[in-house]
């Protein structure tokens, strides 16, 4: 997924498109996207200064339902979005909160609670007014039925704050754990809150047989969003909301059949945008739904990984050098891209996961036997090994890191490369090496850097500043001179005469 997204971005070609807007001084209506600049300009000229007719004014009462309670993945996503926490950091802090009896079991894939928990959840929701510093009691509705669904709770219910957390308070918690606990608490209040109600107005205008529209949105009841905004203001002060503005007001007084006299027409240029690089938030979402179209309708476990393993999968990719973090983004490394390039197609597809999840489900229902399942696994492994053996040598060489030659060996004349701890001769039979940490330099509080090594190999000496004299307890400058003894490096100091 990471490499596919990177390739889409790299190969993306920006394309221009155009829109024409009409205005009578109060109301502005806009056309659909127009691919051709010439067509857009013709429409602008055609409509500019002419009359336009209001053909429709549609007003609708709409609602947005409250969000669900958190399972592990949705909480990890929100913690990344609001606070920049990695999925692993969120899981680690949640585990600590769980062990401190401040939250319920974190490794859950359910966003609901069971019928027998209604009274407990009601008590927790009502207690949030005192527990969360940014809430008022009037913001708590306690519509518990919305979060109750026995059929959608398997082993563990949604993540909730505990009664013990409300009794202890958040005073002794670190900033990160406090943020998570407030996030979980406000989600409980949102999930049991009222709907967000708004009036949506759409005005359609016709000019020269072309349609132009404007949409407006006015909140009627903020509902659960009032809690969300209070949380943002208190906990995410320096972060702009990524939610669209609640209010987009259209001017009053426009009705069907009205004529707009002498409208002004303007053309605007827009550009298509490439897909965005994954953040931990969006990657977790993609992992959760990956390959869903390829899964059998009866398959219970879908996506890549489970709520408990997705964070670890991401961390392993980073630790293995196949992915890296840059700010909030997660990017594939060169090694990661090369690996995907040579990997067999079936290993890259979520359909492989789908196939084996279906096999496990069939075994659970007694439709296939364990031996049949294991034979399939062995067969798949043998197939993968055969494919890997068939990878051409030039493709395997993609993973060999190009080594930089920093100089020639003064003993045998072979190339010298940089290693983790030294600069070594490429001839394995030669003992020559310049060690980054050696007793001679360490006694003067210095180590061998690449610049020094290059000059020693080229000139036999390098000027070093800031050497330390223990005897005089002071620093001095000198030339480090390379000598050889039995094919090994030996060092001495020389003090060049100062120019008069």
State where each predicted segment sits.
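Basic, low-complexity terminal or inter-domain segments flanking catalytic cores
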Residues: 8-11, 17, 87-88, 92, ...
